[in-house]
C-alpha cells in the first residue's frame, strides 16, 4: 500500500479471513500515489514500483522474499509522477516500466535489462497531463501495445507496438472528450 504521508510503502499481511495486519513500512522516496507489484528481476520475489506524486520521481523497491523490501531506488522524471505500470513491452521476457508525469506532460518508458536494472528508453508526450498508461495487446499479435490517458485534455491515445524488441510505437487512435484517470485490461 502506498501512503503519501509519511512517504511509505507499507506491507500488510493477509490473515486468510479477509483481514490484514501491518507488517512493515519503508520510505518510497517521495510520497507514493500509486504502486504496482511484479517480479522485476526474475528472482521469484515480488518487487514494487511506485509513482511518487509528491516529487519528480518513481521508485523501485526490491522484495526480499520474506515480506520486506529493500530501500527505494528512484528514477527522476519531469514532475508529479502520478501513475506506474509494468508490462513486457519489448517481448524479452521481463517487465518494463512506464511512469506517467502529470505536471511534466508525458509518459516515460524504462526498459528492463532482465536483472531489474532499468534504463530510460523513450518518452511519449501528452497534450496536457500524462495521467495513466495501460499496456495491453490491442491488435492480438502477441506483443503489448499502449493506451495513454491524458486527464486534463480528456483524451485517450492508442499506440501500436510495431517492432517488438525494438520498441517502435505507431499512433493508431486518439479520442477526445473523455475523462480517464485509470484503466485495466486482462
Residue spans of the language-model regions?
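Hydrophobic beta-strand segments that make up the repeating blades of beta-propeller
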Residues: 1-3, 48-52, 97-101, 146-149
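Beta-propeller blade termini
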Residues: 33-42, 82-89, 131-140
Amino acid at each position: 500500500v502506498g501512503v503519501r504521508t509519511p512517504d511509505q510503502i507499507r506491507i500488510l499481511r493477509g490473515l486468510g479471513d479477509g483481514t490484514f495486519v501491518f507488517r512493515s513500512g519503508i520510505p518510497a522516496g517521495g510520497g507514493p500515489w500509486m504502486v504496482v507489484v511484479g517480479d522485476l528481476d526474475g528472482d521469484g520475489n515480488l518487487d514494487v514500483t511506485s509513482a511518487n506524486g509528491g516529487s519528480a520521481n518513481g521508485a523501485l523497491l526490491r522484495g526480499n522474499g520474506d515480506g520486506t523490501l529493500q530501500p527505494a531506488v528512484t528514477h527522476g522524471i519531469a514532475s508529479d509522477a502520478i501513475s506506474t505500470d509494468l508490462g513486457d513491452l519489448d517481448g524479452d521476457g521481463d517487465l518494463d516500466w512506464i511512469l506517467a508525469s502529470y505536471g511534466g506532460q508525458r509518459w516515460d518508458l524504462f526498459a528492463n535489462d532482465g536483472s531489474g536494472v532499468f534504463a530510460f528508453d523513450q518518452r511519449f508526450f501528452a497534450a496536457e497531463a500524462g495521467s495513466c498508461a495501460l499496456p495491453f495487446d490491442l491488435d492480438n499479435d502477441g506483443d503489448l501495445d499502449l493506451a495513454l490517458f491524458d486527464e486534463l485534455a480528456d483524451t485517450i491515445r492508442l499506440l501500436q507496438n510495431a517492432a517488438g524488441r525494438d520498441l517502435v510505437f505507431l499512433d493508431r487512435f486518439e479520442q477526445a472528450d473523455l475523462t480517464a484517470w485509470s484503466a485495466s485490461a486482462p
